[in-house]
């Protein structure tokens, strides 16, 4: 909340703040539009939920005015499954152990798809 409050105070009145957060459902690893596995998004959702509560509190306090909300898919593209698996090696979100052999065997481009919410907020 402290960082958010400092950010809002740094923006001139009627200036804009963009808030981008991951949202549920869980992200998925996909090949040719087919879901290979679901990725547990809870470690990231926990942080995102806390940020949402903080932004919503500023909206209720009329420090911010929510002007626009856009929920959309974000896809991260990988050359193959091994690259996807390597990208998750040091992340809080982990791929399911049971899906690792199948993912590593993918020799063609694949993606991770996740839902995101972009909110345009105006400082009051």
For each of these PLM feature ranges, what is it?
Residues 1-16:
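A short glycine-rich, Lys/Arg-flanked "PGG" loop and its adjoining helix->strand segment in the class I
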Residues 7, 17-19, 77-78, 88:
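Long, contiguous hydrophobic alpha-helical segments, chiefly transmembrane helices and signal peptides
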Residues 15-49:
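Conserved class I S-adenosyl-L-methionine
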Residues 41-69:
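Active-site capping/gating segments
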């Amino acid at each position: 909340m402290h960082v958010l409050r400092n950010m809002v105070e740094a923006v001139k009145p009627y200036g804009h703040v963009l808030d981008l957060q991951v949202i549920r459902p869980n992200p998925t690893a996909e090949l040719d539009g087919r879901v290979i596995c679901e990725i547990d998004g809870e470690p990231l959702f926990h942080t995102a939920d806390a940020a949402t509560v903080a932004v919503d509190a500023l909206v209720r306090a009329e420090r911010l005015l929510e002007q626009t909300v856009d929920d959309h898919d974000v896809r991260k593209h990988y050359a193959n499954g091994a690259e996807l698996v390597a990208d998750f090696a040091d992340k809080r979100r982990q791929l399911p152990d049971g899906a690792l052999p199948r993912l590593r065997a993918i020799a063609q481009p694949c993606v991770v798809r996740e839902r995101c919410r972009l909110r345009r907020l105006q400082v009051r």
